[in-house]
Structure formats: C-alpha cells, structure tokens
C-alpha cells in the first residue's frame, strides 16, 4: 500500500513509542514477582510513550493541536488540525503482563477523522487507515466480517471502569447480547477491539464511557474496512459521548437494537 507523508509520520511516531513500550513491558513482567509491584513503572511507561509521540508529531507538524490522555488538550496555531492520541490503550493489560495493548493516533481535520494508526507492539501488528484509502494491517487490506446473523457472531465489549459508568446497565446489556450471539469477548483495549472488528476477527463491538483518544483511530479504521459505527443513540457523536456500537451494516444495526433493549425497558 502507498502511504501519504502524513500517515508515514504517524506510523513512525507510533512505532517509536511502541518500541519504548515493548522494552518497558519486558520490565513489567519482571516486576510482577517483586514486592514493589509494577504500578508506578507503568505510569512512567505511559508518560514516556506520550512524550515520544508528542515530540515526533510536533516536529513533523509544528502547528497542529493535540488531545492526549496525559496532557489533555493542547492548542495549536493551526486550528483546523488536531492529533488525538492514546499512548497506551490497555494499561491494565500492560500492568498485568497481558500482551493486548496499543498505541492509538488519529488526525482530526476540521472536525473529521482523516487518518488513523493503531499499533500493538507486543504482536507487531500495525493498523493504518486514511479517509478514502482503505484500512490495512501490516499492509494487508482489511474487510469487516460478512456474517449477517447475530447467532453466528462473536462480539467484543468493554465494561465500565471502577467509578465510571453504570455497572447495572452494562450487565443488562450483556445479558441481552449473550442471549443472541455465539460468544462475547473482552480484550481490555477499545482500540484493539475496533481494530479486530475492522480485521474481521470479531463481528461487532459495543462499549460506553470511552474517551475520544480510545476510539478516534479505530472508528475510521472500521469505516474504511466497510463497516458501520454509531453511538448508543444511533447517531454519530461517538467522540463526544464516548459510546460506540460497531459491525458490518447488518450486525451493527442488530447489535444496537440488542443493547438498546434494556434502556427502553427501564
């Protein structure tokens, strides 16, 4: 696949941060058996990866703004462009030595996501996409799964973090979805959940209580792989309200209907 200069900048930043995370991940696995524990070390790894990405992207496009997990919003001279960055999505997995975590970088232009990169350094899987240019994993073209019956599907989900979201609502949603699908999976990284839907590994995904940096790149990846995404109300305000329902056209619609059942019944 031919990448634009801008996407190459994003890939280089993600892979450089990924190499740093890979080194730190090896150390985290060693710290699992120590008395000190790996918690503080993981926080440092997260910040270090964000510093790398911030430096790389700022050097390549000095005027662009940022929305980042650690730094928050950073205004740029160019108000039309903004990087949306999660340097380590799947922190709890990383903390526990589980190799399901990712770097996620998206570029927003005039309010629209136009490019995205998701990189899982533990598995060396690089997902890339540009608006109108398709979706790829390690240069292989991606397409969402073609199953059209919920009963045949494997669906990904996330659950509310402690202190965020409503666990009771989630359990009712989960019960309704489990009654209609072949299986439910929780990876612990929304960025990878969306990437797996784009790659056809999972048929759909839903979650609430997310931040824009968790999902910005993945939303475009799914669209460019032929999939459909909406928020829990069926609209397109995913980055603002933090809810996502994704799949191919048929499954996304059926999954949205399934997860909405308890909301209308309460």
Swiss-Prot record:
Q: Which SUPFAM superfamilies match?
A: Carbohydrate phosphatase
- Names of the cofactor(s): Mg(2+)
Q: Does the keyword Transferase apply?
A: no
- CDD domains the record matches: IMPase (cd01639)
Q: What is the E.C. number? A: 3.1.3.25
Under the heading Pfam families, the entry gives: Inositol_P
State one molecular function term (GO). metal ion binding
Q: Coiled-coil stretches, from where to where?
A: none
Please tell me where substrate binds in this chain.
69, 88-91, 185, 214
Q: What positions does the entry give for Mg(2+) 2 binding?
A: 86, 89, 214
Q: Which reaction does it catalyse?
A: a myo-inositol phosphate + H2O = myo-inositol + phosphate
**Is Magnesium one of the keywords UniProt gives this record?**
yes
Specify which residues bind Mg(2+) 1 according to the UniProt entry for this protein. Answer: 69, 86, 88
State the UniProt keywords alphabetically.
Hydrolase, Magnesium, Metal-binding
Matching PROSITE patterns: IMP_1, IMP_2
* One annotated GO biological process: inositol metabolic process
Q: Which family does it belong to?
A: Belongs to the inositol monophosphatase superfamily.
Protein name (database record): Inositol-1-monophosphatase
């Amino acid at each position: 696949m031919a990448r634009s200069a801008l996407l190459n900048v994003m890939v280089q930043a993600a892979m450089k941060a990924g190499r740093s995370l890979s080194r730190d991940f090896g150390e985290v696995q060693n710290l699992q058996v120590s008395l000190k524990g790996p918690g503080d070390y993981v926080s440092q790894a997260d910040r270090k990866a964000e510093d790398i990405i911030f430096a790389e992207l700022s050097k390549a496009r000095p005027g662009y703004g940022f929305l980042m997990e650690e730094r928050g919003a950073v205004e740029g001279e160019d108000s039309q462009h903004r990087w949306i960055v999660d340097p380590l999505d799947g922190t709890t997995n990383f903390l526990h030595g589980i190799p399901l975590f990712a770097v996620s970088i998206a570029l927003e232009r005039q309010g629209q996501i136009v490019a995205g990169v998701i990189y899982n350094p533990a598995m060396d899987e690089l997902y890339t996409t540009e608006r109108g240019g398709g979706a790829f994993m390690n240069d292989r073209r991606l397409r969402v799964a073609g199953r059209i019956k919920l009963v045949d599907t494997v669906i990904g989900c996330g659950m509310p973090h402690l202190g965020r979201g409503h666990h009771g609502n989630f359990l009712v949603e989960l019960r309704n979805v489990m009654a209609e699908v072949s299986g439910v999976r929780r990876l612990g990284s929304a960025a990878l959940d969306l990437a797996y839907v784009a790659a056809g590994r999972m048929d759909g995904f839903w979650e609430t209580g997310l931040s824009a940096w968790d999902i910005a790149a993945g939303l475009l990846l799914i669209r460019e792989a032929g999939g459909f995404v909406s928020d829990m109300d069926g609209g397109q305000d995913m980055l603002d309200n933090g809810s996502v329902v994704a799949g191919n056209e048929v499954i996304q619609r059926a999954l949205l209907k399934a997860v909405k059942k308890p909301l209308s019944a309460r």
